Amino acid sequence: MDDFAIHVAVGNVYGLIGNEANALQPKKRPLSSMAPTIVLREGRPELVVGAAGGPRIISATLQTILNVLDFHMSVSSAVEAPRIHHQWIPDRLNFEAGISPQTRKGLEERDHTLREQSALGVAQAIARQGAQLSGAADSRKFDRARTE
């Protein structure tokens, strides 16, 4: 039910403030952060990523993609890497343990308000390298798929 604004101007379980445009009504679609993503290379699927976690879905999905494509991490390392998330209100940058002290210092020097938080989204991903597929299930969630 947190995809709808049950009470206008009151935060939901994720801290998002709802308004009348997203009020609960019959035949209305809820606001959603779902972002199942397929990355193509030369028209073929290269990476598939999805996540759970309300407004943290987009951050978890994007950071997993960047970790694989830009930072050349394995799919399992990309899924397990610590994450950051900002959602406008409240005006603070949440981060997971494991973010380097240098990164934290740099963010503080740029006047970000920081707060350590656990499990900023839960991602699942499959990467293709040639004919080889590699899958990763986020250990932030206890009931996960096996990736052996």
Residue ranges and their predicted role:
Residues G98-E148:
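Cofactor-centric catalytic regions
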Residues H7-A9, R56-L62, R144-E148:
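A short, polar/proline- and glycine-enriched secondary-structure boundary/capping micro-motif
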Residues V48-A52, D91-N94:
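Second-shell loop/turn segments in exported
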Residues A51-M73:
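Alpha-helical support elements that line or immediately flank enzyme active sites
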Residues M1-G43, L47, F71, V75:
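Active-site rim segments in enzyme catalytic domains, especially the processed small/beta chain
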Residues M1-F4, R29-L31, P36-P45, A52-R56, ...:
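Short, glycine-/Ser/Thr-/acidic-enriched flexible segments
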Residues V10, Q25-P30, T61, D70-S118:
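Extended C-terminal subregions enriched in glycine
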